[in-house]
Structures are given as structure tokens and as C-alpha cells.
UniProtKB/Swiss-Prot annotation:
<feature type="binding site">
    <location>
        <position position="195"/>
    </location>
    <ligand>
        <name>substrate</name>
    </ligand>
</feature>
<feature type="binding site">
    <location>
        <position position="303"/>
    </location>
    <ligand>
        <name>substrate</name>
    </ligand>
</feature>
<feature type="binding site">
    <location>
        <position position="295"/>
    </location>
    <ligand>
        <name>a divalent metal cation 2</name>
    </ligand>
</feature>
<dbReference type="InterPro" id="IPR000994">
    <property type="entry name" value="Pept_M24"/>
</dbReference>
<feature type="binding site">
    <location>
        <position position="426"/>
    </location>
    <ligand>
        <name>a divalent metal cation 1</name>
    </ligand>
</feature>
<dbReference type="InterPro" id="IPR018349">
    <property type="entry name" value="Pept_M24A_MAP2_BS"/>
</dbReference>
<dbReference type="Pfam" id="PF00557">
    <property type="entry name" value="Peptidase_M24"/>
</dbReference>
<dbReference type="GO" id="GO:0005737">
    <property type="term" value="C:cytoplasm"/>
</dbReference>
<dbReference type="InterPro" id="IPR036390">
    <property type="entry name" value="WH_DNA-bd_sf"/>
</dbReference>
<dbReference type="InterPro" id="IPR001714">
    <property type="entry name" value="Pept_M24_MAP"/>
</dbReference>
<keyword id="KW-0645">Protease</keyword>
<keyword id="KW-0963">Cytoplasm</keyword>
<feature type="binding site">
    <location>
        <position position="226"/>
    </location>
    <ligand>
        <name>a divalent metal cation 2</name>
    </ligand>
</feature>
<comment type="function">
    <text>Cotranslationally removes the N-terminal methionine from nascent proteins. The N-terminal methionine is often cleaved when the second residue in the primary sequence is small and uncharged (Met-Ala-, Cys, Gly, Pro, Ser, Thr, or Val).</text>
</comment>
<keyword id="KW-0378">Hydrolase</keyword>
<dbReference type="InterPro" id="IPR002468">
    <property type="entry name" value="Pept_M24A_MAP2"/>
</dbReference>
<protein>
    <recommendedName>
        <fullName>Methionine aminopeptidase 2</fullName>
        <ecNumber>3.4.11.18</ecNumber>
    </recommendedName>
</protein>
């Protein structure tokens, strides 16, 4: 999804020391208490031997109790163990740490910047919690997703895992605002690049020849981790996926404090468009989708709010610079089609506008639905399945009324030309004062 938010450093809770400590934490639960030592113990009822009887009385055999082994807590498949029980000290793994280069190289060793980075560690802990949930859920999903599954099964399986690992089922009022799913799970097939999740009754089935973008987010107290990957079963699409993964990693490498957006976009496009893919005997250049962007991420605002910034994936963008303390989703999209998307298909994604006008609503259904949205999602995006799950029904008229009045935004699926194939990879990065942290980085991508 796209975005804006310029979080000042004063609003950040960044602590590099907490992340380093996380490396030493094993994902185990507390061990059971060990059994007491019993060497040399005798039965109290055993009497002294009678005089002259040297054989009748015998010492009772020692009873050596076996020590109980501690039970290691590990994640289940599918993931259902709350993450805090695997990390009882609440110290979660750090992401990939990248030192700043060139004119910003001094930040890595500058004591003032290091001190600033150690402040407000709650911010970093919440981000790392969300990132570890994302890693564990997606790593299982990449193994479990197979042709023949419905898109609804795939999306809901991911969402149930996120709810379980964060400990926020989201059924009680306000629970989803404390943690859980940050936005609807995108399961975008082939020419559809973004913003598609199945509505109720959807029967679409994943096929072997499909290319599916899986885009989901996790948040803890509004600290959103946004990351996406692409699945293709047929190796014919390998170059398409490689191009987009390379482009995303190039964008991450280029990103940093005082770096211009236009420079990042140019580097991304150059990396991506150096690839081509052959499908059924025809070679297609991989094109960067020029009207899709990365974005800043704000608290409870996936696209950063009214002051958010966009990160282009083609050359020629504006001269805006990245700033210290900002959080970015670096995402790139490649296509075998035109490299341009448009609205298409049935809308499923919605979000309440942060600075929506105070409009008098005439429809009672719209008033009631707005109350449900505010108390359960705030400004986090939601989909129609989430309203169904909360027991809402016959809400479409009210929802459309909220959209028409400029209170809720609708995000239709974004698609290139039919017959084309698109791919996406995405990571969330934190521009900390002294280092750049790719918070969502994992062994998978």
C-alpha cells in the first residue's frame, strides 16, 4: 500500500542495545523445576536391626528421582503460539543492521547519535515484535501455500496466525487497535498487482501457473510492519521474481538519511529493467510499474498520513529527501505488461481517512458502521470480511455512503493489462539516528 508520515525523532523509541541483547535469547519457555536430589535418603520407617541378626536388616535402596527435562517451547505449524511466550524477556530479534555510508558514515560512531538511538526503546521493541510475527507467519505460509487452495483459505490462514501470535483475536471492541493485523491480506494474482483480498463467497482457486503477491501487515500498538513476497510454482517466472527482489534490495541499499527520492527511484528502475523473462517462447522485458510507489509509514497510518512521502520506483521523481527517524516501506513492482496499473475488479480494501470532514450522516446504517470502524480499526485499513467477522451485516449501503461523504477511502484492486504477470517484494526499514535497520528482513528474503 502507499503512504506518508514524517515522524520526528522525538516521537521514536529507538534502542539498538535491546536488539543486540535479543540475539542471546533462545525461543524457549521456562524449564520445569528440577527434581530434588535424593542421594543418601532412607525410609524413615526403617527400624534398626536387632542385635545378633546380621542379615535380616537391610538398608532400603536409594531412590534416585530422574530429573525432569525442561520443555522447550517452539512455534507450531500452522503458527498458533503467542510470540511473547517464546521470548519471555520481551527482547525480539533485530532486523538487518546496515551502517550509513559516505557523508553519513560518521553517524555509526558518533556518540551523540548513538545516545539518541538508545532512547525510547519501546518503539523499537514493538516494531521488532511485529516483525518477528511477520517472519514466522510468512515462513510457514511460503511452505504451506499450494495450488488448489482457495484465496480465502490462504488469506484467512495468514490472518488467524497473525492474531494468534500477537495475542489479539480482534473480536472485542478495541482489541485490534492494540495489536494484530495492520491491513487486509493481499493475495493478488497475475496481472493484479495490489489491493486484492477475497470478499465473502469468493471461490477463486490458486493454480499452478499463477503468480501470487502476498502482502500483509502486522502491528503492535500501531507500529506497522509492512512486507510482501511473491509465490510462483512454475520456474518460468523465476526471472520476474529475481528482478523485483533485486530492485527492492537495491532500493533498500540506496535508502538513507538525506537521500533524494529521485535517486532511489532511478536505481530501482535500472536494477529491475536489466532483466527479461521468457514465457511460452516470447521474451518480455520486466518493467517497473511506474504508478506504484513505496511510502512512509506512520503510527496507525499505513501510508504515512497527510505529511507522508512516496518512494518512486522509476527515475524522474521529486527531490524530496529522506529524514532521520522516518519509517519506510520499500516496495517494488515489476510487470511483463505495460508497467502501469488501473483500478479494476470488486473493491475489498477500505480505510477511515485520518482527517476526514465532520459530515452529518443521514443514514443510520452509515452512522452505526462508522462507530464500528472507529472503535475496531481506527485509521487502519480493513476489508469486508473483517466487518463480517464482527457480526456486521447489510452494511454495504452505509459503507458506500461513508465513501461518498469522504469519510472512508475505498482502495480498488490495481491491475496491469490482462494476460500480463506482476511481482512484488517489500520490506519495512527504520532510519535510526546511527544505523539503518531493515526490520522485516528474514532468511527467506
Amino acid at each position: 500500500m502507499a503512504a506518508q508520515v514524517a515522524s520526528g525523532v522525538g516521537n521514536l523509541n529507538l534502542n539498538s542495545e535491546g536488539g543486540a541483547a535479543a540475539k542471546n535469547i533462545s525461543a524457549q519457555g521456562s524449564p520445569e523445576n528440577e527434581a530434588r536430589e535424593s542421594d543418601g535418603e532412607y525410609d524413615d520407617d526403617q527400624g534398626a536391626p536387632e542385635l545378633g541378626n546380621t542379615t535380616a536388616a537391610k538398608k532400603k535402596k536409594k531412590k534416585t528421582k530422574k530429573k525432569k527435562k525442561g520443555t522447550s517451547k517452539v512455534q507450531t505449524e500452522p503458527p498458533r503460539v503467542i510470540l511473547s511466550s517464546l521470548f519471555p524477556n520481551n527482547q525480539y530479534p533485530e532486523g538487518e543492521i546496515i551502517e550509513y555510508q559516505n557523508e553519513n558514515a560518521y553517524r555509526t560512531t558518533n556518540e551523540e547519535k548513538r545516545h539518541l538511538d538508545r532512547m525510547n526503546n519501546d518503539f523499537l521493541a514493538e516494531y521488532r515484535y511485529a516483525a518477528e510475527v511477520h517472519r514466522q507467519v510468512r515462513q510457514y505460509s511460503q511452505k504451506a501455500i499450494k495450488p488448489g487452495q482457495t484465496l480465502t483459505e490462504i488469506a484467512e490462514g495468514i490472518e488467524e496466525s497473525v492474531r494468534a501470535l500477537t495475542g489479539h483475536p480482534g473480536l472485542e471492541e478495541g482489541d485490534n487497535l492494540r495489536g494484530g493485523i495492520a491491513f487486509p491480506t493481499g493475495v493478488n494474482l497475475n496481472h493484479c498487482a495490489a489491493h486484492y483480498t477475497p470478499n465473502a463467497g469468493n471461490k477463486m482457486v490458486l493454480q499452478y501457473e499463477d503468480v501470487m503477491k502476498v502482502d500483509f501487515g502486522v502491528h503492535i500498538n500501531g507500529r506497522i510492519v509492512d512486507s510482501a513476497f511473491t509465490i510462483a510454482f512454475d520456474p518460468v517466472y523465476d526471472n520476474l521474481l529475481a528482478a523485483v527482489k533485486d530492485a527492492t534490495n537495491t532500493g533498500i541499499k540506496q535508502a538513507g538519511i538525506d537521500v533524494r527520492m529521485s535517486d532511489i527511484g532511478a536505481a530501482i528502475q535500472e536494477a529491475m529493467e536489466s532483466y527479461e523473462v521468457e514465457i511460452k517462447g516470447t521474451s518480455y522485458p520486466v518493467k517497473a510499474i511506474r504508478n506504484l510507489n513505496g511510502h512512509t509509514i506512520g503510527r496507525y497510518e499505513i501510508h504515512g498520513g497527510k505529511n507522508g512521502k512516496s518512494v518512486p520506483i522509476v527515475k524522474g521523481g521529486d527531490q524530496t529527501k529522506m529524514e532521520e527517524g522516518e519509517v519506510y516501506a520499500i516496495e517494488t513492482f515489476g510487470s511483463t505488461g505495460r508497467g502501469y496499473v488501473r483500478d479494476d475488479m470488486e473493491t475489498s480494501h477500505y480505510a477511515k481517512i485520518p482527517d476526514a470532514p465532520n459530515v452529518p450522516l443521514r443514514l443510520s446504517s452509515a452512522k452505526n458502521l462508522l462507530n464500528v470502524i472507529t472503535k475496531n480499526f481506527g485509521t487502519l485499513p480493513f476489508c469486508r470480511r473483517y466487518l463480517d467477522r464482527l457480526g456486521q451485516d447489510k452494511y454495504l449501503l452505509g459503507l458506500n455512503n461513508l465513501v461518498a461523504n469522504g469519510i472512508v477511502d475505498a482502495y480498488p484492486p490495481l491491475c496491469d493489462v490482462k494476460g500480463s504477470y506482476t511481482a512484488q517484494f517489500e520490506h519495512t526499514i527504520l532510519l535510526r539516528p546511527n544505523v539503518k535497520e531493515v526490520i522485516s528482513r528474514g532468511d527467506d528474503y
